[in-house]
Regions:
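Conserved small/polar residues in nucleotide/adenosyl-binding loops
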Residues: 132-139
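Helical scaffold of the NTase/Pol beta-like nucleotidyltransferase catalytic core
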Residues: 1-47, 87, 91
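Active-site nucleotide-donor binding segment shared across nucleotidyl transfer reactions
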Residues: 37-68, 74
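Short alpha-helical segments and helix-capping/turn motifs at coil-helix boundaries
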Residues: 31-35, 114-119
């Protein structure tokens, strides 16, 4: 996990006009997105959507999104979709755990949406939560 310095974060957040803890969370989310983009399997099966996608790729909006919304993109059978979602879940959770995050028991899983909540200790020493949502669209 990247070690974020409280003083440096405070300075950068203030210059950008944001609260330090929210600013740190967005930096952490960007690292997760970099990982997803660097992995061929994840990049092939997932699409970033929602406010984070718009803010980080199209516009330079003065808004900090604090979650990641992903869509499972292949058009597969229910069984194949479930198999790939299982692999994606394992890869994402392994990366997050290796990066110092802990999966919360409040994470939720259903046939159409997985909502991962990952806990970490922020630069201020507080426990914080990172959200990742994975939507799957089973079509056959």
């Amino acid at each position: 996990m990247i070690a974020y310095n409280k003083i440096e974060l405070e300075k950068a957040a203030k210059q950008a006009g944001f609260v330090r803890d929210t600013f740190e969370k967005v930096l952490r989310l960007k690292e997760v997105l970099k990982y997803i983009n660097s992995d061929a399997y994840l990049r092939e099966h997932l699409a970033l959507k929602g406010g984070t996608a718009i803010n980080m790729t199209i516009f330079n909006l003065p808004r900090l999104s604090v979650d990641i919304d992903l869509d499972f993109t292949p058009n597969l059978s229910k069984d194949d979709t479930q198999m790939h979602r299982k692999q994606i879940t394992e890869q994402l959770c392994e990366y997050m755990e290796e990066s110092g995050y802990y999966r919360s028991e409040s994470s939720r899983y259903s046939h159409s949406l997985d909502a991962f909540l990952f806990l970490y200790q922020n630069a201020g020493g507080n426990r914080a939560v990172s959200y990742t949502h994975l939507r799957a669209h089973e079509t056959r």
